[in-house]
Design a protein with these regions (language model features):
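Conserved hydrophobic/aromatic beta-strand scaffold that supports enzyme active sites
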Residues: 36, 49, 74, 91, ...
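Short hydrophobic/aromatic-rich beta-strand segments that constitute the beta-sheet cores
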Residues: 50-52, 75, 133
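Short beta-strand segments
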Residues: 21-54
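Short, active-site-adjacent segments that bind or coordinate small-molecule cofactors and metal centers
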Residues: 107-139
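Short, basic/aromatic recognition patches
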Residues: 3-25
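Residues immediately flanking
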Residues: 39, 52, 77-79, 128
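Short, structured beta-strand-loop surface elements
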Residues: 55-112, 120-121
């Protein structure tokens, strides 16, 4: 196997890699324990934005029950070349909250259509408090 190197990515490069959106994985602690779910996402105004079902399992798990309190999550995006054993990953950590009020309309227009069937009108935003990334490539 060829020699490979791991490169730490800075915030700007990490955001550049995920700027086109796509599929990411939200990780959080649900009422059943650690949970990781794939979602279609958009990078909007420096934050991760995705849609889910109002009162669905993800919505219920992300509610703290305390007005104004945010739920801390992780969000991972990657692009892997299995044949070449190379790729990159970006990890975003920060609070997740529902998008409501006047900002909802613009955010909703910017958000990608979910692949999952059903009505998914609730917008969730993850505001990055920490962004890290790594790339594995040939040396």
């Amino acid at each position: 196997m060829a020699d490979r190197v791991i490169e730490e990515l800075d915030r700007d490069e990490s955001l550049r890699l995920i700027s086109s959106g796509g599929i990411g994985r939200i990780a959080y602690t649900s009422r059943f324990g650690p949970t990781v779910l794939p979602v279609n996402f958009t990078l909007y105004d420096g934050a991760i934005l995705f849609r889910t079902a109002e009162n669905g399992p993800l919505d219920q798990d992300l509610r703290t029950g305390i007005e104004g309190a945010d739920y801390q999550v992780a969000f991972e995006i990657d692009d892997i070349d299995m044949a070449g054993a190379m790729g990159w990953s970006v990890l975003i950590q920060g609070p997740a909250h529902h998008v409501r009020g006047p900002e909802r309309e613009d955010a909703f227009r910017a958000c990608v259509e979910p692949w999952a069937p059903g009505i998914r009108e609730l917008l969730v935003r993850i505001v990055p408090s920490r962004i890290t990334g790594r790339r594995i490539s040939l040396s």
